[in-house]
Regions:
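Multi-bladed beta-propeller domains
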Residues: 1-10, 14, 37-63, 94-112
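Short strand-connecting beta-turns/loops that link adjacent beta-strands
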Residues: 6, 15, 26-28, 80, ...
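Residue-level detector of Asp-centered blade-edge/turn motifs that repeat once per structural unit
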Residues: 15-17, 68-69
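Conserved beta-propeller blade signature
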Residues: 20-22, 74-75
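Inter-blade boundary loops/turns of WD-repeat beta-propellers
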Residues: 25, 37-39, 91, 136
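Structural motif
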Residues: 28-36, 81-88
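Serine-hydrolase catalytic core recognition
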Residues: 53, 61-164
Length: 164
């Protein structure tokens, strides 16, 4: 059902009565794959969702799924511009429903005021190192602009971008 790949790491796997949901990582990004036991489905939720996976500055994972006999899978999503969101995804009709989204204190936050992007730096050994950037959309990008930088990367550990 799942072929071996040196480029893909399986982080989590949930079994349901008619399908399995696989949380896998490739190039530092998490993808959620749905595979039906009868070979009737095999797709990535990232490609069948209204959530923004285009700018690649997100965290995405399987949520708490206590029901075995269901066609729904609970997921957790957030990005550098979207607060933590719990949603339920129907694997048959590929529709999602937001169950809960983290409230931002002060109620003045508007994600449309921010932009995020994913860039890469090349290490001495030629490996590409992902860099996630979030900024106000009006921030000037020049050498006078202050920057808060945080990073970690070793032993296969990835720091996923998260809303803060």
């Amino acid at each position: 059902m799942i072929q071996h790949s040196d480029d893909i790491l399986i982080d989590d796997l949930e079994l349901f009565s008619g399908f399995m949901a696989i949380e896998q990582r490739e190039n530092g990004l998490v993808y959620l794959r749905v595979i039906g036991y009868d070979n009737d489905m095999d797709y990535f939720i990232n490609e069948n969702s209204s959530l923004d996976f285009q700018n690649e500055t997100y965290s995405f994972s399987l949520g708490y799924n206590p029901e075995f006999n269901t066609e729904n899978v609970r997921l957790s999503y957030n990005s550098l511009t979207v607060p933590s969101t719990i949603l339920e995804y129907n694997t048959n009709n590929k529709q999602e429903k937001i169950l809960k989204q983290q409230e931002v204190l002060g109620n003045k936050f508007n994600s449309d005021n921010y932009t995020s992007e994913r860039l890469f730096a090349v290490a001495h050994d030629g490996k590409k190192i992902p860099i996630s950037i979030v900024r106000h959309k009006d921030t000037k990008l020049n050498s006078d602009t202050p920057l808060l930088q945080y990073g970690y990367g070793s032993y296969g550990i990835t720091v996923d971008p998260r809303f803060s």
